[in-house]
């Protein structure tokens, strides 16, 4: 069990908002480009309001001090996208090991799962134990 599964979830009520144009991000979104099932392309680049506020502050600081800026690679993602990316990563790892796999027996390959879970959280639909990136307001 991952450490975040032991931490009680307390939603702070902060809403998801669109990332403002003062912040730069990839367009199209890298996962959308791979075929990830975003239902609405206009809702891809969203974060909790407090996260946006902090990123704007850091970005302003970087620009003022060094003429650098943040380039956002990823943001909130729905569970369907998490599942798509997890399965994609799993398939790629299986291909590297020359393993033919179906997702019905995904747990039969713990060594592959371990590699994938270094970068991707398992796409759990359990509201008591969601993946760590997920905003519960959208479960």
What name fits each language-model region?
Residues 1-22:
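N-terminal regions that are enriched for targeting/export leaders
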Residues 107-134:
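Surface-exposed short loop/turn segments
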Residues 44-77, 87-92:
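Active-site acidic/histidine clusters and adjacent loop/turn architecture
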Residues 25-44:
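Acidic/histidine-rich, surface-exposed loop or edge segments in extracytoplasmic proteins
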Residues 99-109:
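Short mixed-charge
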Residues 137-139:
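Conserved small/polar residues in nucleotide/adenosyl-binding loops
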Residues 71, 76-80, 90, 120-124, ...:
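Phosphate/nucleotide-binding catalytic core
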Residues 79-99, 116-117:
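Charged, often glycine-rich, active-site loop that binds/positions anionic groups
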């Amino acid at each position: 069990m991952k450490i975040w599964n032991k931490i009680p979830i307390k939603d702070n009520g902060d809403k998801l908002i669109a990332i403002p144009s003062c912040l730069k991000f990839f367009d199209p979104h890298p996962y959308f480009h791979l075929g990830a099932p975003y239902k609405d392309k206009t809702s891809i680049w969203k974060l909790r309001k407090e996260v946006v506020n902090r990123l704007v502050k850091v970005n302003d600081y970087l620009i003022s001090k060094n003429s650098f800026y943040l380039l956002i690679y990823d943001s909130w993602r729905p569970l369907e996208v998490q599942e798509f990316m997890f399965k994609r990563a799993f398939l790629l790892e299986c291909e590297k090991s020359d393993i033919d796999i179906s997702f019905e027996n995904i747990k039969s390959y713990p060594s592959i799962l371990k590699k994938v879970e270094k970068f991707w959280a398992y796409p759990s639909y359990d509201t008591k134990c969601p993946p760590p990136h997920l905003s519960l307001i959208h479960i």
